[in-house]
């Protein structure tokens, strides 16, 4: 599903979903990078405003979090932790379903 792609592909998640979707992601243990981007887009239902915030976030990412086309080391480590959490969850789900067969 599209909402899991940022975690799999190691990018900062900015997922356009229903309001307060970030609460579910945080509950699952994912880092949403609230300390470096504006995550208020999760709490607005106005699409134009949501996309304005996300557009500003892309500028922050490009100007402050990337060096020579790569994420800064501290950001990259956090992205890899998100990826690991996602993959572990998938592995657990797969084996649970497999054992049910």
Feature map (PLM): residue ranges:
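Pol beta-like nucleotidyltransferase catalytic core
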Residues: 3-9, 13-101
């Amino acid at each position: 599903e599209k909402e899991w792609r940022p975690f799999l592909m190691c990018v900062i998640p900015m997922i356009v979903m229903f309001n307060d979707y970030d609460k579910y992601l945080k509950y699952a243990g994912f880092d949403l990078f609230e300390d470096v981007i504006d995550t208020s887009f999760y709490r607005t239902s106005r699409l134009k405003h949501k996309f304005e915030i996300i557009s500003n976030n892309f500028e922050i990412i490009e100007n402050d979090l990337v060096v020579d086309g790569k994420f800064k080391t501290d950001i990259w480590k956090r992205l890899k932790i998100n990826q690991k959490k996602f993959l572990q969850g998938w592995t657990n789900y797969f084996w649970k379903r497999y054992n049910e067969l």
